[in-house]
Design a protein with these regions (language model features):
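Nucleotide-activated chemistry modules centered on ATP-dependent adenylation/adenylyltransferase
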Residues: 2-260
Length: 260
């Protein structure tokens, strides 16, 4: 496989700055880099789009090495990605965000996956979190922006320190907000590369893989939860509803701020 750094030197683009870390004061971002070379996000995204899920994961492991991090949500797509990655390299870095509001079944899934793969997850939790759950349940925050920002987004920023590319399990079929998700691209939220290896997979393909490879998965999926987050803001979705209809049900919110 030809290294990305050999063929994708990037011309300047108005969305990015040419020199220096961080913003240049005009809202522009630093130019994306792989292996010390500035690269063209659109070109590299198009090339990785042509890869299959396992090939894309193998490419990312080879390209980013120890600067690659796999974010694990303990949902069905995480089970698939973990199995693929572990078969390629048993030493890849798996981490998760512990909001301390996850379902008991989610923590149990974490433990079963750790045993299945013989690994330890790196856990990230908000330092000294305020008592947010009671305020959320009391309806003080509307759609829960502050809770997600505190327990998820801020914690994710810490988790990504030292990471050049992170791996997510989002798919285009999840919701309208994810319909155009690339398999690989520059994540402007965190100023890092992001790989979505299962971007083009549907539920049937995910479940066939899990069953064929006998990978542990979250039992809440068998109880009407197509998407699983924190207990206070996750409910089952009715048949035929959007896969994320059970997240922040009754509100216009569909994302926590990490993926959208």
């Amino acid at each position: 496989m030809q290294p990305a750094t050999d063929i994708r030197l990037r011309p300047l683009h108005e969305d990015f700055e040419a020199e220096g870390p961080g913003s240049n004061g005009n809202g522009h971002r630093p130019l994306p880099v792989i292996g010390g070379n500035v690269v063209d996000p659109e070109r590299i995204s198009a090339e990785v789009e042509e890869m299959g899920a396992e090939e894309a994961i193998a490419w990312a492991i080879d390209t980013f090495g120890s600067a690659l991090g796999f974010a694990v949500s303990f949902q069905k797509t995480s089970s698939v990605i973990m199995d693929m990655a572990h078969r390629i390299d048993p030493n890849v870095h798996f981490f998760y965000l512990d909001t301390e509001l996850l379902f008991p079944e989610t923590y149990e899934t974490r433990d079963r996956l750790a045993t299945h793969f013989g690994i330890e997850f790196e856990r990230f939790v908000q330092d000294n979190p305020p008592n947010l759950r009671e305020r959320w349940e009391a309806g003080e925050w509307g759609e829960g922006d502050e809770c997600c920002a505190t327990r998820k987004v801020a914690t994710m920023r810490r988790a990504l320190e030292g990471i050049d590319c992170w791996v997510s399990g989002i798919r285009r079929v999840d919701s309208e907000t994810r319909a155009d998700a690339p398999r690989f691209g520059w994540d402007v939220r965190f100023d890092r590369w992001k790989l979505n290896p299962l971007a083009d997979w549907d539920d049937k393909r995910v479940w066939n893989y899990i069953k064929d490879q006998k990978v542990p998965y979250n039992p809440l999926h068998d109880q009407g939860y197509p998407s699983i987050g924190c207990m206070p803001c996750t409910s089952p979705a009715a048949e035929g509803e959007d896969a994320r209809a059970g997240r922040w049900a009754g509100t216009d919110r569909t994302e926590c701020g990490i993926n959208g």
